[in-house]
């Protein structure tokens, strides 16, 4: 799988900004079919950094309920928390 298809978009929130400063981790929304090895290779190829570890979180899709009735579905997604090697940083996330 091509690394441009694996990394969908960066995840920028208060939580990810806090963990970036605390523990050199950055977060991405990734393709649900990608595994940890593919995610690691994609980040290393896209940003030219060394990756120490990758943790993934899967959120399954669920029904959207309004007034007791199912009115739609909430899409599921997969997040990857990537820990960078000591001394590495991604310039894209700096200043956020």
Curated annotation (Swiss-Prot):
Provide the family line: Belongs to the universal ribosomal protein uL23 family.
Name of the gene this protein is made from = rplW
Which Gene3D superfamilies is this protein grouped with?
Answer: 3.30.70.330
Output the Gene Ontology terms for molecular function. rRNA binding; structural constituent of ribosome
Q: Which GO terms describe its biological process?
A: translation
The root-end lineage is:
Bacteria, Pseudomonadati, Thermodesulfobacteriota, Desulfovibrionia, Desulfovibrionales
Entry-linked InterPro entries: Nucleotide-bd_a/b_plait_sf, Ribosomal_uL23-like, Ribosomal_uL23/eL15/eS24_sf, Ribosomal_uL23_CS
Assembly information from the UniProt record: Part of the 50S ribosomal subunit. Contacts protein L29, and trigger factor when it is bound to the ribosome.
Query: Could you give one GO CC term from the UniProt record?
Result: ribonucleoprotein complex
Name the SUPFAM superfamilies for this protein.
Ribosomal proteins S24e, L23 and L15e (SSF54189)
Task: State the protein's name.
Answer: Large ribosomal subunit protein uL23
HAMAP family, sorted: Ribosomal_uL23_B (MF_01369_B)
Tell me the keywords, alphabetical order. Ribonucleoprotein, Ribosomal protein, RNA-binding, rRNA-binding
The record's annotation in Pfam families points to: Ribosomal_L23
Q: What does this protein do?
A: One of the early assembly proteins it binds 23S rRNA. One of the proteins that surrounds the polypeptide exit tunnel on the outside of the ribosome. Forms the main docking site for trigger factor binding to the ribosome.
- Originating species: Nitratidesulfovibrio vulgaris (strain ATCC 29579 / DSM 644 / CCUG 34227 / NCIMB 8303 / VKM B-1760 / Hildenborough)
